[in-house]
Amino acid sequence: MDTSSKENIQLFCKTSVQPVGRPSFKTEYPSSEEKQPCCGELKVFLCALSFVYFAKALAEGYLKSTITQIERRFDIPSSLVGVIDGSFEIGNLLVITFVSYFGAKLHRPKIIGAGCVIMGVGTLLIAMPQFFMEQYKYERYSPSSNSTLSISPCLLESSSQLPVSVMEKSKSKISNECEVDTSSSMWIYVFLGNLLRGIGETPIQPLGIAYLDDFASEDNAAFYIGCVQTVAIIGPIFGFLLGSLCAKLYVDIGFVNLDHITITPKDPQWVGAWWLGYLIAGIISLLAAVPFWYLPKSLPRSQSREDSNSSSEKSKFIIDDHTDYQTPQGENAKIMEMARDFLPSLKNLFGNPVYFLYLCTSTVQFNSLFGMVTYKPKYIEQQYGQSSSRANFVIGLINIPAVALGIFSGGIVMKKFRISVCGAAKLYLGSSVFGYLLFLSLFALGCENSDVAGLTVSYQGTKPVSYHERALFSDCNSRCKCSETKWEPMCGENGITYVSACLAGCQTSNRSGKNIIFYNCTCVGIAASKSGNSSGIVGRCQKDNGCPQMFLYFLVISVITSYTLSLGGIPGYILLLRCIKPQLKSFALGIYTLAIRVLAGIPAPVYFGVLIDTSCLKWGFKRCGSRGSCRLYDSNVFRHIYLGLTVILGTVSILLSIAVLFILKKNYVSKHRSFITKRERTMVSTRFQKENYTTSDHLLQPNYWPGKETQL
């Protein structure tokens, strides 16, 4: 064979043979120089997004840790605190639909950066009331600045040195104090600041997660999302720890002489420096915005995601309505042109049964989550007699790390075992069921009510009493002119707490430094006392001896439950991402976030708070006579309301999760069979084509070149 023929053969062999009308599957891989910027920028975005998640989670965790502090500082009920907490979701609701839909078609990193700035400003606004309100005034018994002087608490109204109840004040004095008390409405700034936080946080999840999922490889997407979600859990750890630290500092630190403060962090009237953490969180949020202004609008897609639209597994669950969802290109894209596909996109999402059912499941589950997390510090304080600082410390250092570990473990499991969509749904359901069963055991790990004379036990300390305001008075204090609206708890030698030293019938008192001791208390004397004394000290008595052990058991079960439930977080999120069209991903995440905010984030803290308020035994009163925050809860009723609501919502969530798995299996089996049939036909066709290609290659070999066989 001549040289020209050999060159033609070599050239032909180097060229892939393609059938007529079939596109080439040859892909030109970018060089290492081309790959590096893409991977580098994606990792920069991953780090920036993780830091933003940390910042927003820090502020959110800190807000949860200051719920009790805000309630006491502004003297408002739990239901109103729930409204303040829900204002974050209201802010999300205002813009989530537009941000998730239009933001996906614009410069996503810059939109996230702008959101961080708004979020930081809102966080700083929350702290502003501290600098405009008058100093915090708590109800206190002040015998005298002279430590050697003894005054009878029983003759409270006759002493000009002591504060009296608003019920005994003259109308003119009440009117004057009401004018000063207008600062209590400053909680509206906390509401507005949290509202701004919600608006600023809106683009972070739908645009950030979709950006990662778009440009990361399919194998790494779950791992990257798991990393982001894990960092997001680390944020609340620092948030609750910061809350624990600030709760130990007096609210007006730097503004008053702390030597004059007679209460301690264990006192139910104590308010910590709740505002300090918001200043720190606000600055961190502003710093988190910086990297996003320098990131590109888009990145080169990963090689494994080039054909993601035709993924065989994903196609089993996505309903194709043959609508062409085109994204306008260029900076001059018109708003009306982008809005044209809004309703068809929305119809496509809600027409997807897997997406719709999972949306319902998550909404119910997040109702229980939002309500439980919002009032968990209060539950620990009231149920186990712990201080606010200790409750926040325990949640931040023990409970939340278990959640972070569970989320990270879920991402690792998804990556390592390459779990399918059905497998992800099973893992999600399994973790929910197991966590639900563990949670049921918390009903048995409660503490009994503290013995409070006239509220939970009689003045003789022998039998429980039903709550009635007049039950605070008894024969032992009938000659004392006491206020029934005050809350100045005194712990008697008999282990019973009295609403005030006056209601305990105490005749004399002594003050030594910050300690106040009451003597000759007639009501203490009629109840059994271990020492036989009829004295008492300022503050509530500790819970019974078995309560610390119950608290330890509660922590252990709570940690295991948190880990188990969070293990299904990433599988559930991957299920959400894989059951929708790629071009609708940001929009679907936005609608998902919208539903969670509207149907869970806003109402859950409110109705949890309203129902928790029904367990209040002793309300505080403001200077104008209106009802303030709750001073004492019925521990048993509180426990059954708090845990019962969570269990009811968890039951509904599990039933919906079973429905999701049923739909997935039904679609998987039917479409998988159809896919196999098509695959068999394709394999037969491919085998025939390969035989022809092999014959063609054989005919082109130098040792076989018969001139008469011209057909290929």
Swiss-Prot record:
Highly expressed in brain and in Leydig cells in testis. Localized in nests of Leydig cells (at protein level). Expressed in choroid plexus (at protein level). Not strongly enriched in cerebral microvessels. The chain crosses the membrane at residues 44-63, 83-103, 110-134, 185-213, 233-253, 272-296, 349-370, 391-414, 419-442, 555-577, 587-612, 647-664. Its main location: membrane. One of its GO terms (biological process) is monoatomic ion transport. Glycans are attached at residues 146, 510, 520, 533. InterPro entries: Kazal_dom (IPR002350), Kazal_dom_sf (IPR036058), MFS_dom (IPR020846), MFS_trans_sf (IPR036259), OATP (IPR004156). It is found in: Cell membrane. Residues 64-82, 135-184, 254-271, 371-390, 443-554, 613-646 are extracellular. GO terms for molecular function: bile acid transmembrane transporter activity; organic anion transmembrane transporter activity; sodium-independent organic anion transmembrane transporter activity; thyroid hormone transmembrane transporter activity. Disulfide bonds join 476-506, 482-502, 491-523. Keywords: Cell membrane, Disulfide bond, Glycoprotein, Ion transport, Lipid transport, Membrane, Transmembrane, Transmembrane helix, Transport. Belongs to the organo anion transporter (TC 2.A.60) family. It catalyses: 3,3',5'-triiodo-L-thyronine(out) = 3,3',5'-triiodo-L-thyronine(in); L-thyroxine(out) = L-thyroxine(in); L-thyroxine sulfate(out) = L-thyroxine sulfate(in). Residues 470-525 form the Kazal-like domain. It comes from Homo sapiens (Human). The keyword Secreted does not apply. This is Solute carrier organic anion transporter family member 1C1. Mediates the Na(+)-independent high affinity transport of organic anions such as the thyroid hormones L-thyroxine (T4), L-thyroxine sulfate (T4S), and 3,3',5'-triiodo-L-thyronine (reverse T3, rT3) at the plasma membrane. Regulates T4 levels in different brain regions by transporting T4, and also by serving as an export pump for T4S, which is a source of T4 after hydrolysis by local sulfatases. Increases the access of these substrates to the intracellular sites where they are metabolized by the deiodinases. One of its GO terms (cellular component) is plasma membrane. Residues 1-43, 104-109, 214-232, 297-348, 415-418, 578-586, 665-712 are cytoplasmic. It is a multi-pass membrane protein.
